[in-house]
């Protein structure tokens, strides 16, 4: 059984909230029937199911990219009232907020970037059919800058293109939320593209740099997380502009009187104000902060006063015991003392 394939499949089914199926390798997926597997994945649009059935190898990578985006979201908001969690049905893209808030904007952007990042990485590593290194970045010499393309450049255009077709296919309805979601998807992918790296290697006698070959690589995903968190803090409130004939929204504009200015391509946009995320609310998708750990003395969002929304907090005391001050005695044993520490933990009421 292919251990790497089993691990990949495990990540996929875990991210989908499904039972961990211990099956081995891509051939096992085919044997089970791609249509059976794809029909069991919740929350996919018809176009996405068709892609899943035709490219089951890619759907595994998409699941990993989506989970990478969700993990980064949880890291960036780990100390806030909203910690990238939501109520509702779990899909390949996680549980989704029902309000078109700036938190929803961040979620869509980070997942779109995660899927594009994962697809591009899989192509570079030779783990997907129909793609590989960027063929246009091979051999061309940049005389003015003294280097030429070499190595294996990440084919970010393929990764973004494939991810766009799959991720955007879930936006079926023609309404303002769809326009918002599509804009934030594109913003996440655009920010990924803008943060691609150029790596180079020198060639020459005795360490000289007579010639230099360069190639493009993907950025660390944590770096994208920080960039998108800054975009979240500066998110733009927008509203739809409707066509006069069918009254359907056609594009988004910044929500200001007498203004028809559109947001920038890399802006995160939202159409509704955020709830306070203090209480569990099925209407908004908020899970509330009851039971969340908080910092008694911190003045920031992680502090108990803000995290618990004025409800107060519970104090939990526990003892931590460990071996300490260990010394080697001749001959031949080690003697240690037992150390202990009483610790307090605080959780929101």
UniProtKB/Swiss-Prot annotation:
Query: In its UniProt entry, what is this protein called?
Result: Protein Wnt-7a
Might you report a single GO cellular component term?
A: cell surface
Give compartment(s).
Answer: Secreted, Extracellular space, Extracellular matrix; Secreted
Quaternary structure, per UniProt, is: Forms a soluble 1:1 complex with AFM; this prevents oligomerization and is required for prolonged biological activity. The complex with AFM may represent the physiological form in body fluids. Interacts with PORCN. Interacts (via intrinsically disordered linker region) with RECK; interaction with RECK confers ligand selectivity for Wnt7 in brain endothelial cells and allows these cells to selectively respond to Wnt7. Interacts with FZD5.
PANTHER family according to UniProt:
PROTEIN WNT-7A (PTHR12027:SF78), WNT RELATED (PTHR12027)
Species of origin: Homo sapiens (Human)
User: Which Pfam families does the UniProt record give?
Assistant: wnt (PF00110)
Specify where the region named Disordered linker lies, as residue ranges.
238-266
Family recorded in the similarity comment:
Belongs to the Wnt family.
Keywords attached to this Swiss-Prot or TrEMBL record, sorted alphabetically, are: Developmental protein, Disease variant, Disulfide bond, Extracellular matrix, Glycoprotein, Lipoprotein, Secreted, Signal, Wnt signaling pathway
Which post-translational modifications are recorded for this protein? Palmitoleoylation is required for efficient binding to frizzled receptors. Depalmitoleoylation leads to Wnt signaling pathway inhibition.
Residues annotated as glycosylated are: 83, 127, 295
Q: As annotated in Swiss-Prot or TrEMBL, what is the tissue specificity of this protein?
A: Expression is restricted to placenta, kidney, testis, uterus, fetal lung, and fetal and adult brain.
Q: Which Gene3D superfamilies match?
A: 3.30.2460.20
- What function is annotated for this protein? Ligand for members of the frizzled family of seven transmembrane receptors that functions in the canonical Wnt/beta-catenin signaling pathway. Plays an important role in embryonic development, including dorsal versus ventral patterning during limb development, skeleton development and urogenital tract development. Required for central nervous system (CNS) angiogenesis and blood-brain barrier regulation. Required for normal, sexually dimorphic development of the Mullerian ducts, and for normal fertility in both sexes.
InterPro entries per the UniProt record, alphabetical? Wnt, Wnt7, Wnt_C, Wnt_CS
One biological process GO term for this chain?
A: chondrocyte differentiation
Q: What is the effect of changing residue 206 to A?
A: Does not affect interaction with RECK
Q: According to the UniProt entry, which disease involves this protein?
A: Limb pelvis hypoplasia aplasia syndrome: A syndrome of severe deficiency of the extremities due to hypo- or aplasia of one or more long bones of one or more limbs. Pelvic manifestations include hip dislocation, hypoplastic iliac bone and aplastic pubic bones. Thoracic deformity, unusual facies and genitourinary anomalies can be present.
